[in-house]
């Protein structure tokens, strides 16, 4: 008897839970009249994922669970639509701008010319930045700048030019010579011949200072400038010796 009586209280407990769940579902559904109870035939996604994707609702014990209530989407066929006329009933007072601009462009297309190509970049040589009016001369083991002699004129000078040239030579001979390898304090251009005089001293004489610079015991970076022979460098060679290591961006 006890075994048969046991299922009765269990069924009563389940029925109470069902009534409670249904009452909760009814109160929830009362606020959403668009929801309907599950018909028991459709498979509702709420049972597996907790979401209902149907227009009807269903969940635990066949009624809506307030936790998973979603607004259904409006069917496409119920959306408002606008009728599109097949042909305009009356001519519109508008023009197609693209067609008008195209016609206007084709009328004047022959007048248009392509833009001029940009000028190619101009590069300058580093030697062009310096005035090549001097020569590099080795005197007593030192590299000195000596002004170049002017190029001889091919045309014959008039008597007036000859007299003026002779007067200039006599004046130049009376001018005292300045040491062209002097220090910057005694010459404004620090070694460059300032008065334009042409020096013809021989390089055969070696002073004690030149001997000291050429000795192997007291070697210094300046001694690397001393040539083996005392020669008169041409302007092109002087550019290589003096200007080769200069990097300039123009």
Curated annotation (Swiss-Prot):
<dbReference type="GO" id="GO:0007399">
    <property type="term" value="P:nervous system development"/>
</dbReference>
<dbReference type="GO" id="GO:0048512">
    <property type="term" value="P:circadian behavior"/>
</dbReference>
<feature type="compositionally biased region" description="Acidic residues">
    <location>
        <begin position="202"/>
        <end position="229"/>
    </location>
</feature>
<feature type="region of interest" description="Disordered">
    <location>
        <begin position="201"/>
        <end position="250"/>
    </location>
</feature>
<comment type="function">
    <text>May play a role in neuronal and neurobehavioral development.</text>
</comment>
<protein>
    <recommendedName>
        <fullName>UPF0524 protein C3orf70 homolog</fullName>
    </recommendedName>
</protein>
<dbReference type="InterPro" id="IPR029670">
    <property type="entry name" value="UPF0524_fam"/>
</dbReference>
<dbReference type="Pfam" id="PF15823">
    <property type="entry name" value="UPF0524"/>
</dbReference>
<comment type="similarity">
    <text>Belongs to the UPF0524 family.</text>
</comment>
<keyword id="KW-0524">Neurogenesis</keyword>
């Amino acid at each position: 008897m006890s075994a048969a009586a046991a299922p009765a209280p269990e069924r009563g407990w389940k029925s109470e839970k069902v009534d409670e769940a249904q009452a909760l579902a009814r109160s929830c559904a009362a606020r959403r009249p668009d929801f309907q109870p599950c018909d028991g035939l459709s498979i509702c996604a709420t049972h597996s994922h907790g979401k209902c994707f149907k227009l009807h609702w269903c969940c635990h014990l066949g009624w809506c669970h307030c936790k998973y209530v979603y607004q259904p989407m409006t069917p496409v066929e119920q959306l408002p639509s606008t009728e599109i006329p097949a042909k305009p009933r009356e001519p519109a007072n508008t023009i197609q701008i693209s067609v008008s601009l195209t016609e206007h462009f084709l009328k004047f297309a022959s007048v248009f010319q392509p833009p001029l190509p940009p000028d190619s970049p101009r590069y300058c040589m580093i030697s062009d930045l310096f005035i090549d009016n001097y020569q590099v001369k080795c005197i007593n083991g030192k590299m000195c700048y000596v002004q170049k002699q002017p190029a001889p004129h091919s045309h014959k000078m008039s008597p007036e030019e000859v007299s003026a040239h002779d007067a200039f030579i006599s004046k130049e001979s009376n001018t005292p010579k300045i040491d062209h390898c002097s220090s910057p304090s005694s010459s404004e251009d620090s070694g460059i011949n300032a008065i334009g005089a042409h020096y013809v001293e021989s390089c055969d004489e070696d002073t004690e200072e030149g001997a000291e610079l050429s000795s192997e015991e007291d070697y210094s970076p300046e001694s690397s400038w001393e040539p083996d022979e005392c020669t008169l460098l041409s302007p092109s060679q002087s550019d290589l010796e003096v200007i080769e290591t200069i990097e300039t961006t123009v």
